[in-house]
């Protein structure tokens, strides 16, 4: 049995979402904060997939245990997919949730198409390099003003029609059921036995080779 897996993030909001959704997962999920500070991964990937893998493998190699990481963001159609991988730092150096939301509203001023989607890619990596990848997406639109007090990031602006609420107006249970991250984590829960078996096999190898990341797309358990 795999004793633990570390969640490669210092974002406590993400930690809460992961731990809540995966509370019945058969592996102990530990927060990165429990291991003390480590060098930050360089998130210079061209998409969410690359950045999630970079964070997961970076953490797994440093700590010597499996790591799970996500990269997620908002893609606004009228802005050609922006802010995308730059969602957390959209308003520049020292960006905050508030400044990012303000920047988004400025960029969308006068635009009729306010459709958008949240995307989340989760990578589970072993210290030797292999990784499994999961993805979730949620479609909505950007409002002209903030609504709600819960959540984080762009949640106060992201309107989800099915509930007639923004993500910041949803309870944690509601958000976890429909959000991009919730959908990706639901896939992980559904494949928990296979994931545990895969991790055990990889960790039992003395010198696991570091394959190309694309080799593991589609989660082929035979590799």
Curated annotation (Swiss-Prot):
Cofactor binding remark: Binds 1 Mg(2+) ion per subunit.
Any Pfam family the entry gives: Ham1p_like
GO annotation, cellular component aspect: cytosol
GO molecular function, one term: metal ion binding
Reaction equations catalysed: XTP + H2O = XMP + diphosphate + H(+); dITP + H2O = dIMP + diphosphate + H(+); ITP + H2O = IMP + diphosphate + H(+)
Catalytic machinery residues: 71
UniProt keywords, alphabetically: Hydrolase, Magnesium, Metal-binding, Nucleotide metabolism, Nucleotide-binding
EC number, as in UniProt: 3.6.1.66
Binding of Mg(2+), residues: 71
Cofactor(s) the protein requires to work: Mg(2+)
Record region (Disordered): 203-223
An individual GO BP term: purine nucleoside triphosphate catabolic process
Binding-site residues, substrate: 9-14, 72, 152-155, 175, 180-181
Purpose: Pyrophosphatase that catalyzes the hydrolysis of nucleoside triphosphates to their monophosphate derivatives, with a high preference for the non-canonical purine nucleotides XTP (xanthosine triphosphate), dITP (deoxyinosine triphosphate) and ITP. Seems to function as a house-cleaning enzyme that removes non-canonical purine nucleotides from the nucleotide pool, thus preventing their incorporation into DNA/RNA and avoiding chromosomal lesions.
Family: Belongs to the HAM1 NTPase family.
Summary of subunit composition and partner proteins: Homodimer.
Protein name in the entry: dITP/XTP pyrophosphatase
